[in-house]
Amino acid sequence: MSIKTIKDCDFAGKRALVRCDFNVPLKEGNITDDTRIRAALPTIEYLKSQGARVILMSHLGRPKGEKNLKYSLMPVAKRLSELLGQDVKMLPDCIGDEVATTVSCMKNGDIVLLENLRFYKEEEENCDAFVRKLSQNGDIFVNDAFGTAHRAHASTAGLAAYLPAVGGFLMEKEDEFLGKILRNPESPFVAIIGGSKVSSKIAVLESLLPKSNVMVIGGGMAYTFLKVEGYSIGQSLLENEYIDVASSFLKKAKELDVKVILPLDHVVASEFREDSIPEYVDSVDIPNDKVGMDIGEKTLRKIEEVLVSAKTVIWNGPLGVFEFNSFSKGTAKVAEYVASCSGITVVGGGDSVAAVNKFNLSEKITHVSTGGGASLEYLEGKVLPGIKVLEK
């Protein structure tokens, strides 16, 4: 199902009320990573070029429904002004008379930013009275916040009841690439799924299994699968309550003739600590007194091998304890291999995206998803409220 986009509307002289995802990391009031702001620029610049009056809105952090200047979008307005080369006026609120007055005085091509939507608890509650007030700021609702598309909030889904709703370029791109993976990925299709827990990734594994030719399972959750296969995992993370789930998953993979790659060797430590000394174990079995922390060289070679011929690759989640420097090599290497793959490559999920950005590889990836939880739920095959309201 395709979505309606900004290309389907005439914006000349219209007020475009644009939901962006400006939930950026801040340190002492300074933005430490402006990736999400840059991701919104194509949509903003297009709307401006079409003669729209652009009213931007977003949340930032978790102010819990109260005005808290620590979560003000002022730093975002400053950064937008720099990136766009024009003044982006910061408004003191997201609804109310002062906002209405400023918006009514806007000229075509002007850009303003509303204050943090989550200063009102009604935003997350999708309260109808709040939605109505918000809708008075625009003529057309543009949702470009894929990162919050899995939330049925006032500014992500509610507005579609009061204004014509379309997706921005970022939303369109996410829907196109993630949708292609779910609907008709080109074979061979390799899914690399990492992360610490089976419980948080089993829905993605099960959703992608029927479409995959090869599935690589890494990270902390791999040890539960290795335990099912009869290997010793030492003191590594084990989810006992997911043993049966992992077992039936591996059985189903065999029935579907999907090749599942689990770690063949490991980087281990005596304790799960950042300063632990890495030790290499050249076997699938992990010694009883050791904790699995990362994948080893043999596993990496195997992953590299399957990626050479892959036509479609999805990578979600780290292959080891990426946040500990000594145990981040597996994830870093996989980032390199995915970037070198000649097929369509899609990377989603916080740590895998961080790895790609850390090593400046994002330009070599077909699509780096901006949505953490939203990407995950999309890949699980769930209907996302923020996308559903945009469907043609």
UniProtKB/Swiss-Prot annotation:
Keyword Methyltransferase: no
Pfam family, one: PGK
Pathway(s): Carbohydrate degradation; glycolysis; pyruvate from D-glyceraldehyde 3-phosphate: step 2/5
Domain of life: Bacteria
InterPro entries named in the record: Phosphoglycerate_kinase, Phosphoglycerate_kinase_N, Phosphoglycerate_kinase_sf
Classification via Gene3D superfamilies: Phosphoglycerate kinase, N-terminal domain
Binding site for substrate: D21, F22, N23, R36, H59, L60, G61, R62, R118, R151
Entry binding sites for ATP: K201, G292, E323, G349, G350, D351, S352
Record bears the keyword Cell membrane: no
The protein's Enzyme Commission number: 2.7.2.3
Single GO biological process annotation from the record: gluconeogenesis
Location (main, coarse): cytoplasm
Key words, A-Z: ATP-binding, Cytoplasm, Glycolysis, Kinase, Nucleotide-binding, Transferase
Subcellular location: Cytoplasm
GO MF term set: ADP binding; ATP binding; phosphoglycerate kinase activity
GO cellular component, one term: cytosol
Catalytic activity: (2R)-3-phosphoglycerate + ATP = (2R)-3-phospho-glyceroyl phosphate + ADP
Enzyme class of the recorded protein, top EC level: transferase
UniProt similarity note: Belongs to the phosphoglycerate kinase family.
Subunit and partners: Monomer.
PANTHER family (UniProt xref): PHOSPHOGLYCERATE KINASE, PHOSPHOGLYCERATE KINASE 1, CHLOROPLASTIC-RELATED
Name of the molecule in the record: Phosphoglycerate kinase
Species name: Borrelia turicatae (strain 91E135)
